[in-house]
């Protein structure tokens, strides 16, 4: 491993020990904000520190085994130990390289999830409902909280569009690769001839930004309309114009929120989604420029980005970005998504490593 990388790892290991000591300080325990920030930093440094300690131990093992090679009686055992230690050292170096990759500052944040029915009419709306249920199940398995911000139901079930906020540890980092087009191939319930139809939905995942980081939005650039809520919520829902529609005139982005009974709360929710959408559009533009020389696994949430196909007759799910096909569709639709998310996270890390080595 390069001396510069070892020096960086030593500094991170020292910082890990320093933060550990600070977390036991009574003054810091009393300051909740500082304590939370240091706890987050400690958690982020723990894996690197642990892996580096293991790597250092393996270097000692290699040195000991090399010294034993001079002893004829110990040579055979030493050669075996040396081979094992070198293998382990290589594995740990690969892990450390991944752990040192630049982190996306948004990865630890909550996220807004939008699922929209695309081509396919009623069947697309039903599939949007299935996708939202799949993500909700996945969130449940990770103990994340799902809060519906806005929804427009399909005429025969499902959703024309649904927006939810998902809160918990590392939500955006885990779900960000879901943005893009999702295609379904199945026989709709309304199909009497048993023909397979293809429908599509788009998914967009955006990080929730703290208020201080929301893009500056000029109030003059906003058109705010109020209207009466529709859908579930009891009689009260339809008695006041509590639902809000905000249009950002420069970009044409429209956000509706009618989940709360209070117009004020709906407006606050809609503005936070609007800020996230504007930020996501700016980020996508920047990433497109950066990724012009290499592929970008992060979809834009556009229907032209074809992420996955869910083929019900064959029980098959295919991720087109990494040519991964699994015949485990039932499990996927029940929210067991790690088997699809993990390979694409690893592929993304491999791309980042390749880009770093090109720079070097």
UniProtKB/Swiss-Prot annotation:
This is Peptide chain release factor 1. Keywords: Cytoplasm, Methylation, Protein biosynthesis. GO terms for molecular function: translation release factor activity, codon specific. One of its GO terms (cellular component) is cytoplasm. It comes from Salmonella schwarzengrund (strain CVM19633). It comes from the Bacteria. The modification N5-methylglutamine is found at residue 235. Belongs to the prokaryotic/mitochondrial release factor family. InterPro entries: PCRF, Pep_chain_release_fac_I, Pep_chain_release_fac_I_sf, Prokaryotic/Mito_RF, RF-1. Coiled coil: none annotated. Pfam families: PCRF, RF-1.
